[in-house]
Swiss-Prot record:
Enzyme Commission identifier(s): 5.4.99.-
Protein name, UniProt field: Uncharacterized RNA pseudouridine synthase jhp_0682
Active site residues of this protein: D136
Coiled coil (UniProt feature): none
UniProt catalytic activity: a uridine in RNA = a pseudouridine in RNA
Pfam families from the UniProt entry: PseudoU_synth_2, S4
Domain of life where this protein originates: Bacteria
CDD domains, A to Z: PseudoU_synth_RluA_like, S4
Annotated GO biological process: enzyme-directed rRNA pseudouridine synthesis
Gene3D superfamilies documented for this protein: Pseudouridine synthase, RNA-binding S4 domain
Amino acid sequence: MQKVFIAPTHYKRIDEFLAKELQISKNQVLNLIKEGLVFCQKKEVKKGGLALKEGDAITLLTPKIVPKPLKKELDLEIEVIFEDEDLLVLNKPPNLVVHKAPSVKEPTLVDWLKSQNYELSNLGLKERYGIVHRLDKDTSGGIVIAKNNFTHVCLSEQLKTKMMGRYYIALLSTPLKEEKMSVECYLTRNPNNRLKMIALKAAKKEKSRYSKSEFTSLLTSQNGMDLIGAKLFTGRTHQIRAHLEYLNRHIIGDNLYGLNGVLSKEEIRIMLHAYLIEFKHPRSEQKLRFKVPLLKDMLEYLKKVFDKENLDEVLDEEKILHAFIAK
C-alpha cells in the first residue's frame, strides 16, 4: 500500500511537510526516509532537506509491520468492538495508559496490543505503534488502532480535518449553566501543578495549543448531578476536564480537577467515557460509527443516580448526536 501527498505550495524541506501532514516529528520522518519509504516525483528521497515545488507528488510506502511480541501475555481484558485488516476499535478500560512515557512504569495499551500479536502501524515511536489518538489514563471508552501505515495516515488526516467525530459521556457534580456550552481556547501546563492543564483566557502563549469542545446536558438528577455529552473538535491532553474546569464544572470521581481534589465520598474512578466515534474507513471510504458500551462500573453508578428508563433513552446514539445538531 502507499499514500500520495501533493505539495500545495513550495516547501523548503520535505521533512517539515511530511511532519505536518502525518502529525509526527521530523525525526520520525527522517526514520521513514532512512528506511527507503519516501519518494518525491517517483524518486527515492535521501535527505529530509529536499525542497518541494508546488504540485510535487510525495509517495509514502506503507509496508506490513508486525511488532515483536512481548514474551509474556498481559493479564488485561479489553473488548474489541470492531476489527478488520486495517484497524481495530477497542473499549479501553480505565486506569490504563495508552503508551509508554518516561514517567510510565506500568503496562500500557500498546504493550497489550503487542502481546496479542496485532499488526500495527509504525509511523510513531516504537512505544506508540498503532496509536492514532489517545485517551487519558483514567478515561474509558473507544479508541481506534491503525494496523498499517496507510490506515494511520488516513485516520490522522481525518483527525486533522475534523472529519473524525468523537463524543464522550460524563457525569458532573453540578449542572451546566446553560443547556449547551462550548469552550474554544488555548491549553497549556498549569504552572502551579504540572500534572494539570489550564485554559488560557488571553491569546496564545508559547507551548500552548488550540482546543475546542462542545457540551450539552442530557439528563439532570434530583440531587443536581448532570449527565452530559461532550464533543471534541481537537484532542489535547485532559481537554474535556480542563475545559469543564474553565466553566467551573467538574466530573464526578476526578480527583485531579475536582473541587478540593474530592467530589465523592465513594472510591470511584472518573465518570468519563468515550462513547461514540465515527470516521470514514481508510480503504472503502464507507462512513463508520461505533457506540462503545459503558463499562459495568460506570453504568452501575449511573443507575444509582438516574431512573433506568430515562438513562436508556438519553444514551441512545441518535439522541446524543441530535443534541449537538439541534439549536
